[in-house]
């Protein structure tokens, strides 16, 4: 997606260097608009979506398999190369990791930037939000040019949702549209894995249980969750 739209005004969180068409009337397809005093991702046939890290759903307990993939590291710095809706990054930040989220899709970046600012200004979530750094860039390009050192890199290549809630399926479907269906074992995701492994000693890749390792690259070990697994690469 190369054209971006907003209703009435340009969102303050929208990436500065990206053009955004400001419209007076509701367009077809996706656009950003004010909804309940916050910017939301809207579409003519869908309910508005926004990201809210202050929601108790982000802070509730339960079995957490992802943090186990980052145990026994020398440091706490993680690069999330596929930020998306930010759920995994928020979970890791809640567990004390310093997370850099990288997102190249301007709509998603806008929602994430707004959510992080809101969380920083909310007492219950301020400390966790301070653990997050948001970057608007292609992840491969960022990893090749940044001087920042990371202790681990996390990848979540999209797959069609299975055995998930209606809301998760809806948000996954929207990600597929926004990111031009670049999911699964595409050349782009394989290049991202290669770049990540060259850049960092630990790389964690989220996979469906039924899927082979990304690019058939065998991990050192796996963390099994009910519907997914986390492949851990070390060197």
UniProtKB/Swiss-Prot annotation:
Keyword Cytoplasm in record? yes
One Pfam family this sequence matches: SAM_MT
Enzyme Commission code: 2.1.1.242
Q: Where in the cell is it found?
A: Cytoplasm
Enzyme category, top tier: transferase
GO CC annotation, single: cytoplasm
Q: Which Gene3D superfamilies does the entry link to?
A: Vaccinia Virus protein VP39
Q: Which reaction does it catalyse?
A: guanosine(1516) in 16S rRNA + S-adenosyl-L-methionine = N(2)-methylguanosine(1516) in 16S rRNA + S-adenosyl-L-homocysteine + H(+)
Cross-referenced InterPro entries = 16SrRNA_methylTrfase_J, SAM-dependent_MTases_sf
Gene Ontology MF, one: rRNA (guanine-N2-)-methyltransferase activity
Q: What is its main location?
A: cytoplasm
Q: Which residues bind S-adenosyl-L-methionine?
A: 87-88, 103-104, 156
List UniProt keywords, sorted A-Z.
Cytoplasm, Methyltransferase, rRNA processing, S-adenosyl-L-methionine, Transferase
Q: Which HAMAP family match?
A: 16SrRNA_methyltr_J
Q: What does this protein do?
A: Specifically methylates the guanosine in position 1516 of 16S rRNA.
Would you identify the family this protein belongs to, as annotated? Belongs to the methyltransferase superfamily. RsmJ family.
- Descriptive protein name: Ribosomal RNA small subunit methyltransferase J
Q: From what organism does this protein derive?
A: Dichelobacter nodosus (strain VCS1703A)
Q: Which gene encodes it?
A: rsmJ
């Amino acid at each position: 997606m190369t054209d971006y739209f907003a209703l009435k005004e340009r969102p303050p969180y929208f990436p500065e260097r990206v053009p955004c068409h400001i419209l007076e009337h509701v367009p077809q397809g996706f656009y950003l608009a004010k909804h309940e005093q916050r910017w939301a991702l809207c579409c003519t046939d869908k309910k508005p979506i926004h990201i809210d890290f202050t929601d108790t759903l982000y802070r509730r307990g339960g079995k957490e398999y992802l943090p186990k993939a980052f145990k026994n590291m020398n440091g706490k710095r993680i690069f999330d190369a596929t930020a998306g809706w930010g759920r995994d990054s928020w979970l890791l930040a809640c567990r004390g990791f310093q997370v850099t989220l990288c997102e190249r899709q301007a709509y998603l970046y806008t929602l994430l930037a707004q959510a992080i600012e809101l969380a920083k200004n909310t007492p219950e979530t301020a400390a966790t939000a301070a653990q997050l750094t948001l970057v608007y860039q292609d992840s491969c390009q960022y990893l090749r040019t940044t001087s920042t050192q990371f202790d681990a890199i996390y990848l979540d290549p999209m797959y069609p949702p299975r055995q998930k809630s209606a809301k998760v399926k809806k948000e996954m479907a929207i990600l597929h549209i926004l990111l031009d269906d670049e999911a699964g074992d595409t050349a782009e995701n394989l290049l991202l894995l290669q770049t990540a492994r060259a850049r960092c000693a630990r790389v964690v890749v989220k996979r469906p249980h039924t899927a082979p390792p990304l690019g058939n690259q065998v991990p050192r070990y796996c963390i099994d969750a009910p519907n997914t697994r986390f492949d851990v690469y070390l060197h």
